[in-house]
Amino acid sequence: EGLLQLPSDK
């Protein structure tokens, strides 16, 4: 989406 994609550690 319009959100900035960070590498999720979960």
UniProtKB/Swiss-Prot annotation:
One GO cellular component, as annotated: cytoplasm
Co-factor requirement: heme b
Keyword annotations: Calcium, Cytoplasm, Heme, Hydrogen peroxide, Iron, Metal-binding, Oxidoreductase, Peroxidase, Potassium
Domain of life: Eukaryota
Enzyme class: oxidoreductase
Record EC number: 1.11.1.11
Main location: cytoplasm
Family: Belongs to the peroxidase family. Ascorbate peroxidase subfamily.
Protein name: L-ascorbate peroxidase, cytosolic
Species name: Pseudotsuga menziesii
